[in-house]
Amino acid sequence: MTAHYVKNRLKYKKLIILFFNYGQRTVKQERYFSKKCAKNLNAEFEEAILPELKKLSTSLLNSNVKAKTIKRNQLKNTSKESLKWYVPCRNLIFLSYALALAESLYIKNKEKYGIFIGFKNEGKEFYPDATSKFIEQINNLQKTVTNKGIKIIAPLINKDKEEIIKIGKKLDINFNETYSCYSGAKTNNIHCGYCLSCRLRKEGFYWSGIKDPTIYAKK
Protein backbone atom coordinates (compact mmCIF):
# COMPACT_ATOMS: atom_id res chain seq x y z
CA MET A 1 0.00 0.00 0.00
CA THR A 2 2.73 2.48 0.98
CA ALA A 3 4.72 1.77 -2.18
CA HIS A 4 1.67 2.45 -4.35
CA TYR A 5 1.03 5.67 -2.43
CA VAL A 6 4.63 6.84 -2.89
CA LYS A 7 4.64 6.05 -6.62
CA ASN A 8 1.16 7.18 -7.60
CA ARG A 9 0.25 9.90 -5.10
CA LEU A 10 3.65 11.35 -4.19
CA LYS A 11 4.91 10.81 -7.76
CA TYR A 12 8.29 9.27 -7.01
CA LYS A 13 9.61 7.69 -10.19
CA LYS A 14 12.32 5.31 -9.01
CA LEU A 15 11.55 2.85 -6.22
CA ILE A 16 13.36 -0.02 -4.54
CA ILE A 17 11.11 -2.48 -2.69
CA LEU A 18 13.26 -3.62 0.24
CA PHE A 19 12.04 -6.96 1.62
CA PHE A 20 13.28 -8.39 4.91
CA ASN A 21 13.62 -12.12 5.49
CA TYR A 22 14.11 -12.66 9.22
CA GLY A 23 12.76 -16.19 9.44
CA GLN A 24 9.13 -15.12 9.83
CA ARG A 25 6.57 -17.88 9.28
CA THR A 26 4.97 -15.95 6.40
CA VAL A 27 8.21 -15.20 4.57
CA LYS A 28 7.10 -17.09 1.46
CA GLN A 29 3.84 -15.17 1.15
CA GLU A 30 5.37 -11.80 2.00
CA ARG A 31 8.14 -12.28 -0.56
CA TYR A 32 5.63 -13.33 -3.22
CA PHE A 33 3.50 -10.21 -2.80
CA SER A 34 6.51 -7.90 -2.40
CA LYS A 35 7.86 -9.11 -5.73
CA LYS A 36 4.44 -8.69 -7.32
CA CYS A 37 4.28 -5.14 -5.96
CA ALA A 38 7.72 -4.36 -7.38
CA LYS A 39 6.68 -5.71 -10.78
CA ASN A 40 3.42 -3.73 -10.80
CA LEU A 41 5.22 -0.49 -9.94
CA ASN A 42 8.20 -1.12 -12.23
CA ALA A 43 10.41 -1.00 -9.14
CA GLU A 44 13.56 -2.84 -8.16
CA PHE A 45 13.25 -5.67 -5.63
CA GLU A 46 15.92 -6.32 -3.03
CA GLU A 47 15.89 -8.91 -0.27
CA ALA A 48 17.81 -8.53 2.97
CA ILE A 49 18.34 -11.74 4.95
CA LEU A 50 18.65 -11.30 8.72
CA PRO A 51 18.80 -14.80 10.26
CA GLU A 52 20.08 -13.57 13.62
CA LEU A 53 16.86 -11.65 14.21
CA LYS A 54 14.94 -14.94 14.42
CA LYS A 55 17.31 -16.15 17.14
CA LEU A 56 16.67 -13.02 19.19
CA SER A 57 12.94 -12.81 18.58
CA THR A 58 10.32 -13.81 21.13
CA SER A 59 7.55 -13.23 18.58
CA LEU A 60 5.07 -15.85 17.42
CA LEU A 61 6.02 -14.70 13.92
CA ASN A 62 9.24 -16.62 14.46
CA SER A 63 7.65 -19.79 15.80
CA ASN A 64 5.30 -22.55 14.70
CA VAL A 65 2.83 -22.03 17.54
CA LYS A 66 -0.73 -21.94 16.22
CA ALA A 67 -2.22 -18.45 16.21
CA LYS A 68 -5.07 -17.78 18.60
CA THR A 69 -8.50 -17.34 17.07
CA ILE A 70 -9.54 -13.73 17.63
CA LYS A 71 -13.22 -12.86 17.72
CA ARG A 72 -14.69 -9.49 16.93
CA ASN A 73 -15.67 -8.78 20.54
CA GLN A 74 -12.03 -9.25 21.58
CA LEU A 75 -10.79 -6.30 19.52
CA LYS A 76 -11.52 -3.75 22.24
CA ASN A 77 -8.31 -4.73 23.99
CA THR A 78 -5.70 -6.52 21.93
CA SER A 79 -2.58 -5.43 23.84
CA LYS A 80 -1.75 -8.90 25.19
CA GLU A 81 -2.26 -10.58 21.83
CA SER A 82 -0.28 -7.84 20.02
CA LEU A 83 2.66 -8.36 22.37
CA LYS A 84 2.84 -12.03 21.37
CA TRP A 85 3.53 -11.00 17.77
CA TYR A 86 5.89 -8.11 18.51
CA VAL A 87 9.44 -8.57 17.21
CA PRO A 88 11.67 -6.53 19.57
CA CYS A 89 13.33 -3.56 17.86
CA ARG A 90 12.55 -4.97 14.42
CA ASN A 91 11.80 -1.61 12.81
CA LEU A 92 14.96 -0.06 14.23
CA ILE A 93 16.98 -2.88 12.67
CA PHE A 94 15.13 -2.62 9.36
CA LEU A 95 15.57 1.14 9.14
CA SER A 96 19.25 0.91 10.07
CA TYR A 97 19.73 -1.48 7.16
CA ALA A 98 17.72 0.79 4.85
CA LEU A 99 19.84 3.78 5.88
CA ALA A 100 23.02 1.82 5.13
CA LEU A 101 21.65 0.86 1.72
CA ALA A 102 20.57 4.42 0.87
CA GLU A 103 23.92 5.84 1.99
CA SER A 104 25.80 3.22 -0.04
CA LEU A 105 23.75 3.99 -3.15
CA TYR A 106 24.57 7.67 -2.79
CA ILE A 107 28.29 6.95 -2.44
CA LYS A 108 28.22 4.60 -5.41
CA ASN A 109 25.85 6.32 -7.82
CA LYS A 110 25.36 9.82 -6.40
CA GLU A 111 21.62 9.06 -6.20
CA LYS A 112 19.81 10.32 -3.12
CA TYR A 113 16.96 8.20 -1.78
CA GLY A 114 14.30 8.78 0.84
CA ILE A 115 13.09 5.90 2.98
CA PHE A 116 9.36 5.26 3.22
CA ILE A 117 7.89 2.86 5.76
CA GLY A 118 4.33 1.60 6.05
CA PHE A 119 3.37 2.59 9.59
CA LYS A 120 -0.28 3.36 10.30
CA ASN A 121 -2.20 4.80 13.23
CA GLU A 122 -2.40 1.99 15.78
CA GLY A 123 -4.45 3.96 18.32
CA LYS A 124 -3.79 3.28 21.99
CA GLU A 125 -2.31 -0.18 21.44
CA PHE A 126 0.80 0.71 19.48
CA TYR A 127 4.18 -0.93 19.04
CA PRO A 128 6.94 1.27 20.50
CA ASP A 129 8.95 1.26 17.26
CA ALA A 130 5.99 2.19 15.04
CA THR A 131 5.12 5.66 16.29
CA SER A 132 5.58 9.27 15.19
CA LYS A 133 7.98 9.75 18.10
CA PHE A 134 10.09 6.85 16.88
CA ILE A 135 10.24 8.31 13.36
CA GLU A 136 11.24 11.69 14.79
CA GLN A 137 14.01 10.16 16.89
CA ILE A 138 15.46 7.99 14.14
CA ASN A 139 15.46 10.98 11.78
CA ASN A 140 17.51 12.83 14.38
CA LEU A 141 19.86 9.86 14.55
CA GLN A 142 20.32 9.64 10.77
CA LYS A 143 21.61 13.22 10.76
CA THR A 144 24.55 11.93 12.79
CA VAL A 145 25.18 8.61 11.06
CA THR A 146 24.78 9.61 7.38
CA ASN A 147 26.55 12.21 5.31
CA LYS A 148 23.67 13.27 3.10
CA GLY A 149 20.66 13.47 5.40
CA ILE A 150 18.46 10.61 4.23
CA LYS A 151 14.97 11.35 5.47
CA ILE A 152 12.72 8.59 6.83
CA ILE A 153 9.03 9.13 6.14
CA ALA A 154 5.89 7.28 7.25
CA PRO A 155 3.32 8.95 4.97
CA LEU A 156 0.29 7.08 6.34
CA ILE A 157 1.12 7.11 10.04
CA ASN A 158 -1.88 9.29 10.93
CA LYS A 159 -4.31 7.08 9.01
CA ASP A 160 -6.09 4.05 10.47
CA LYS A 161 -6.71 0.85 8.50
CA GLU A 162 -10.16 1.98 7.38
CA GLU A 163 -8.78 5.24 5.92
CA ILE A 164 -5.88 3.44 4.27
CA ILE A 165 -8.24 1.03 2.54
CA LYS A 166 -10.21 4.00 1.20
CA ILE A 167 -6.99 5.54 -0.12
CA GLY A 168 -6.09 2.22 -1.69
CA LYS A 169 -9.43 2.11 -3.45
CA LYS A 170 -8.82 5.58 -4.91
CA LEU A 171 -5.40 4.42 -6.10
CA ASP A 172 -7.07 1.44 -7.78
CA ILE A 173 -5.04 -1.07 -5.76
CA ASN A 174 -5.87 -4.74 -6.22
CA PHE A 175 -6.37 -5.75 -2.58
CA ASN A 176 -5.96 -9.40 -3.54
CA GLU A 177 -2.32 -8.51 -4.09
CA THR A 178 -1.81 -7.33 -0.52
CA TYR A 179 -1.01 -9.51 2.48
CA SER A 180 -1.71 -9.09 6.19
CA CYS A 181 -1.87 -12.57 7.75
CA TYR A 182 0.33 -13.43 10.73
CA SER A 183 -0.32 -17.15 10.60
CA GLY A 184 0.10 -18.02 6.94
CA ALA A 185 -1.77 -20.53 4.81
CA LYS A 186 -0.74 -23.22 2.37
CA THR A 187 -1.15 -21.00 -0.70
CA ASN A 188 0.00 -17.43 -1.18
CA ASN A 189 -3.36 -15.83 -1.86
CA ILE A 190 -5.17 -17.21 1.20
CA HIS A 191 -5.30 -15.57 4.64
CA CYS A 192 -5.98 -17.72 7.71
CA GLY A 193 -8.93 -15.54 8.73
CA TYR A 194 -8.58 -16.01 12.49
CA CYS A 195 -5.34 -14.37 13.64
CA LEU A 196 -5.26 -10.83 15.04
CA SER A 197 -4.02 -9.29 11.80
CA CYS A 198 -6.70 -11.01 9.70
CA ARG A 199 -9.39 -9.88 12.12
CA LEU A 200 -8.15 -6.28 11.91
CA ARG A 201 -8.05 -6.55 8.11
CA LYS A 202 -11.69 -7.70 8.09
CA GLU A 203 -12.67 -4.82 10.37
CA GLY A 204 -10.86 -2.31 8.18
CA PHE A 205 -12.83 -3.35 5.13
CA TYR A 206 -16.08 -3.48 7.12
CA TRP A 207 -15.78 0.08 8.45
CA SER A 208 -14.50 1.45 5.14
CA GLY A 209 -17.66 0.25 3.41
CA ILE A 210 -15.53 -1.41 0.74
CA LYS A 211 -16.10 -5.06 -0.12
CA ASP A 212 -13.36 -7.32 1.21
CA PRO A 213 -12.06 -9.46 -1.69
CA THR A 214 -9.68 -11.40 0.56
CA ILE A 215 -9.88 -15.19 0.52
CA TYR A 216 -9.91 -16.45 4.11
CA ALA A 217 -9.40 -20.08 5.08
CA LYS A 218 -11.72 -19.45 8.02
CA LYS A 219 -14.55 -16.92 7.83
Predicted regions: what is each one?
Residues S96, E177-E203:
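Local cysteine-cluster metal-coordination motifs and their immediate loop/turn environment
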